[in-house]
Structures are given as structure tokens and as C-alpha cells.
A protein has these predicted regions:
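Short coil turns that delineate tetratricopeptide repeat
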Residues: 52, 89, 133, 170-172, ...
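Start-of-helix register in tetratricopeptide repeats
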Residues: 56, 63, 93, 100, ...
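Register position in tetratricopeptide repeats
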Residues: 33, 67-70, 104, 148-149, ...
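TPR-repeat structural position
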Residues: 37, 71-74, 118, 157, ...
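Canonical tetratricopeptide repeat
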Residues: 60-63, 97, 141, 178, ...
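Alpha-helical adaptor scaffolds
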Residues: 144, 208-275
Length: 329
């Protein structure tokens, strides 16, 4: 996978967490934002044992499964989201969670799979907007679809522009956010960054969350485009504005790695591991340790990455296996 796609996909995962209403599910949301996916799933499952039709619990369980990074459980997430829609057809957020689960299934299955699911993904997000015009997450999700999907799959700039304009009439600040997303998608990163930073979400926690997500996205895109100084600057701004953010330290470390600043990168990766113990972080640590000539530590890091049965990209897994053999040989 190209570096741009990898980094932006990583940032997009962060956006999975905003489909629950903060006012009605703050405990769940705290667990998800802290990447405590097993705990969130257990809490949701416990709730469902008592209230089988609980929309919040079904949404949280769906997002916890997706957030875990276990690709083999994506169909389970889709099924849970479908049950949410069936039990709560008028719940906007159930439809959004289904769109996200189908999106994960499509991304995991490749281009042909994406084409097959595109219509259902789009329709789920559109239904979310239709049922609740003030659902910011539904609007952001639909905008992401329009930006990412080509016209033949139901996306396109004209639809994205129309959505941003219509959103501005309902939720002005959200309209500005969607326009910033459109600008970022068109490569106008400085303009997008300025608009995102200038947003005034007030007490709207959901809009605050998406402001954070999109600012991370701009920083990650700078890094992916090899504009490392700009990427670091934006991501450090994220750390100042949103101290609990999970993604900024990883993005900064990746920028440092790409510049050969491996000692600095290791500090950031270690910080990331404290909050996000994922296989790709161990893999990146292995790369930096190897570059510094610390063979034994590099092998240990690669082996930690390989110990995860799921969640490590095929290319990374293959490379980690090759590097371990070479380092031990």
C-alpha cells in the first residue's frame, strides 16, 4: 500500500470512534477514545444482555470490533450494525455505524469489493443524514465517501460541494469543516488547516472530535507527501490542542523515520505504544532499531509485531519475517 494511503487509512480509523452520541454514551466513548476496545466491547455486550435492542450498545460493539484491527471480525461488525438498523430503523447513528462497517469490509476486500459495496455504504450515510440533519458524524462520513469514491462509484467533487453547502445552512461550523475536508482532498492543505483551526465548535463535542480528526488528517497528508516539517508542525499543534490524541505522536515519529532521525522516532513510537499497542508500531520500532544497528532489539520488535495474529498489513508482515531471518542469519 502506498505511504499516502497507509497513513490516511490509519488516520481514518481514528474517525470510527465518533458515531456515538457523546451525551448518551460518554462512558463508551471514553473507552473507545482510549483505544480500550476489548473493554468497550465487554461493556456493550453486557448492556445488550440486559437490553438486546440498545442502539448505543450495538453501535459501540460494532465500533469496538472495527477498532480492534482484527480483519477476521469485520463480518461480525457488519452483522451487529445490521441488527442495530433492524432493531432501530429510525436511529441515524445505527445507519452510520453500518456504513462504517461496510466501508471497513470494502477496504479489506480490495477494489472489486469496494465497488460492490459502494452503493450500500453511500446509502447508509445518506440515510443517517436524512434521519438526523444535525448528525455531524453522518455528514462527515458522507463527505469522506464523496471525496474518496470516484464518480462511477457514487462519489465526486460536485456531490461533495453540494453537501458542504447544504450543511452550512443547517450547522454553519460543520459546513466549514466539510469545506476544509474538500480543500484537503484537493491538496489545498494550508487552506484546509487554517479553516480547521479557525473552527469554533463551542460545546458541540462531536464537532470538536471531528475538528481534531481532520487536523490530524492534514498533518498525516503532509507527512505522506514528504513535507515533513509541515507535517510535524501540524501534528505538534494537534498535541497542544488535544493532549489526549492517539495519532499525533505516531505521525511525528513516521516523519522523523523518513528523515533518518531514528533516535527521535523511537521516543515517539514508544509513546505511541503506551496508548496504542498495535503491531504496526512494533514494526516501525524494528525499522528504526535496525537502522541504528541495534540488531537484537530490532529482532525483538519485529517478533512482537509478528506475534499479533491480525492487524499487521501483509506487506509489513512479509517484510518483518524477512528482516528477522536476515538479522538472525
Amino acid at each position: 500500500m502506498h505511504m499516502t494511503t497507509r497513513l490516511l487509512a490509519t488516520a481514518a480509523t481514528f474517525g470510527l470512534l465518533f458515531a456515538i452520541q457523546p451525551a448518551s454514551a460518554s462512558d463508551y466513548k471514553a473507552l473507545l477514545k482510549a483505544n480500550k476496545f476489548p473493554e468497550a466491547e465487554r461493556a456493550a455486550s453486557s448492556k445488550l444482555a440486559q437490553e438486546p435492542a440498545s442502539a448505543d450498545a450495538m453501535i459501540v460493539r460494532t465500533l469496538a470490533i472495527l477498532g480492534s484491527g482484527n480483519e477476521t471480525r469485520i463480518p461480525e461488525a457488519v452483522k451487529q450494525a445490521e441488527q442495530c438498523v433492524a432493531a432501530n430503523p429510525g436511529n441515524s447513528r445505527c445507519h452510520v455505524s453500518l456504513g462504517k462497517a461496510l466501508g471497513a469490509k470494502a477496504m479489506n476486500g480490495g477494489m472489486m469489493s469496494a465497488m460492490g459495496y459502494a452503493g450500500d455504504i453511500r446509502d447508509s450515510f445518506k440515510k443517517g443524514v436524512e434521519l438526523d440533519a444535525r448528525n455531524v458524524d453522518a455528514r462527515v462520513s458522507l463527505m469522506q465517501f464523496y471525496i474518496m469514491a470516484p464518480g462511477i462509484m457514487g462519489g465526486g467533487t460536485s456531490k461533495a460541494e453540494a453537501l458542504a453547502a447544504q450543511t452550512a445552512t443547517v450547522i454553519p461550523e460543520a459546513g466549514k469543516l466539510l469545506q476544509a475536508m474538500l480543500d484537503a482532498g484537493a491538496g489545498k492543505l494550508a487552506k484546509a488547516e487554517a479553516a480547521i483551526v479557525a473552527l469554533r465548535p463551542g460545546a458541540d463535542e462531536e464537532l470538536q472530535d471531528h475538528q481534531e480528526e481532520q487536523l490530524v488528517g492534514v498533518g498525516m497528508r503532509y507527512v505522506a507527501e514528504k513535507k515533513y516539517a509541515e507535517g510535524e508542525r501540524v501534528l505538534r499543534d494537534v498535541q497542544k490542542r488535544f493532549p489526549e490524541n492517539q495519532m499525533a505522536s505516531y505521525g511525528i515519529a513516521r516523519a522523523q523515520q523518513e528523515q533518518g532521525r531514528h533516535r527521535e522516532a523511537l521516543l515517539g513510537l514508544e509513546q505511541t505504544l503506551l496508548k496504542t499497542p498495535r503491531p504496526h508500531v512494533h514494526y516501525r520500532m524494528g525499522q528504526s532499531l535496525q537502522a541504528l544497528g541495534e540488531k537484537a532489539k530490532a529482532v525483538a520488535a519485529y517478533e512482537k509485531a509478528l506475534a499479533f495474529k491480525t492487524g499487521l498489513a501483509k506487506k509489513m508482515r512479509s517484510d518483518a519475517e524477512d528482516q528477522v531471518k536476515a538479522l538472525k542469519g
